[in-house]
Regions:
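Membrane-embedded alpha-helical bundles of multi-pass transporters/translocases
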Residues: 1-324
Length: 324
């Protein structure tokens, strides 16, 4: 109220503006419709998948391919995705939106490369660790009957292979939202869901005890196809992303992870077997195997000169040296 007189004397005249044009509500409404439609498609695929698992369980009650088994496998799968990929991409999203607002393709390219590289430093090793530690790991976390272990462990392993494609799918969503391109997000979701449903149909071709593995494979392959399709589209939109550098980093990380996974598998499963089914054996195999995998991976990262891993590791080592 105190500012009314000074503003009037300064020449300010308030004129009410009627209507809702010019506020960006139209663009917001359009992207909301596209996004909601994509969400409906994704949820539809989830409902179909769970209906199919329920049918298998109903017809073959002796198998362990239940919805609860899928939920348990997905819970383990989502841990690294939630802590690593989602955290990094959430931090990148405001900068991606700013790059789009500024019309800077070069900034967007740089941010996309960061989104493809930074999570991969931990996600690719986590993928291989999930594969080799799946069996003792699920027995450590869940109370399972002997007949339930194999199916759940295989599902976790297959899902683990798809950690990177799932992360790329998350980056694709952030990219589309930053560009206010809900239509592209819907198209990518339709592609992913279509591939997933096609693979899910094969559930009735394989023996019923493999139903859960088929669901895991459908998720992994669908996300892989969707990730590749989006990378092609984004590369065309931005005039290239620089995937050569990204692929070289992924290859080095995969080599280091695979080499570290072999002795880890032998040690972890050896300790697990020595426990004769006791929880201590499962937990010991998982814990010691996990520590061994991390140690071997870091040594191999140094040998292969994976600079990005060393850049993350060196500050932590310096802090530890100072404290000691």
């Amino acid at each position: 109220m105190f500012l009314i007189i000074p503003l009037h004397r300064g020449g300010f005249r308030w004129r009410p503006r009627w209507g809702i044009r010019g506020y960006g509500l139209g663009a917001a409404a359009r992207i909301t419709v596209w996004t909601f439609t994509a969400l409906v498609i994704a949820q539809f695929a989830g409902i179909i998948m769970k209906k199919m698992l329920s049918h298998v369980r109903l017809v073959h009650p002796e198998v362990s391919s239940s919805i609860s088994a899928y939920d348990n496998a997905f819970l383990i799968f989502m841990l690294p995705q939630s802590f690593i990929t989602t955290s990094i991409l959430t931090a990148l999203f405001p900068r991606m939106s700013r790059a789009n607002a500024d019309g800077s393709n070069s900034a967007m390219k740089k941010l996309l490369r960061q989104g493809l590289e930074m999570p991969a430093l931990a996600i690719i090793p986590c993928s291989l660790a999930m594969v080799v530690l799946a069996r003792p790991g699920v027995q450590t976390v869940f109370s399972l009957e002997p007949g339930q272990v194999g199916s759940l462990a295989r599902a976790v392993a297959v899902m683990g292979v798809g950690l990177l494609p799932f992360g790329i799918a998350t980056l694709q969503q952030r990219y589309c939202f930053a560009r206010e391109d809900g239509k592209l997000n819907l198209i990518m979701q339709a592609v992913t869901t279509g591939v997933q449903l096609i693979i899910l149909v094969t559930m009735f071709v394989f023996p019923p005890q493999h139903a859960l593995v088929v669901v895991a494979a459908a998720q992994t392959i669908a996300n892989l196809v969707g990730a590749v399709a989006w990378l092609v589209v984004a590369s065309r939109q931005l005039g290239g992303i620089g995937m050569g550098e990204v692929n070289r980093l992924w290859t080095k990380l995969a080599v280091a992870s695979i080499v570290a996974a072999v002795p880890t598998y032998l040690v972890a499963h050896g300790i697990d077997a020595a426990g004769h089914g006791a929880w201590v054996g499962h937990a010991g195999g998982t814990l010691i195997g996990g520590v061994l995998f991390v140690a071997l991976f870091l040594v191999l990262a140094k040998i292969l000169r994976i600079v990005e891993v060393l850049d993350l590791l060196n500050p932590m080592l310096r802090k530890m040296m100072r404290r000691s």
